Amino acid sequence: MTISREVNQNYGEIIACSVTGKLNAYSGGIANSNYGRIIACWFDGTLKEYESGAIVRYNYNTITSCYWGGNAGQGVFRNHGGTVDATKVDGATVKWQTAVDGMNTALTDNDYQWALGTGGLPVLQKKQ
């Protein structure tokens, strides 16, 4: 799913989500606060740099196989005892294809997978 605005507080599961664009608020690219699980998601864009995280601003639970590009220097602004598996796509050592492979490994028990799209960013598609 592509969402136009991040989630404020996640208490459930966000799986295979992508967000692109510019956020002018102090927030995270996917969610402001994570109390649940975020799995195989990515963000690419511009965040207000101070007190922002590319995936979430505040993490209290689990982030698995998530990736980000853009100006953010960190995947999580503040981690409060949660587990974080989030990687920056820098275009040199980590490319978007690396992100696709990592996110697909985390996607289990569903009919979808990430593929590299024509624009160079991951797109979600039904498994063949």
Identify the function of each model-found stretch.
Residues 1-128:
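Predominantly extracellular beta-rich ligand-binding scaffolds that present long acidic/polar faces
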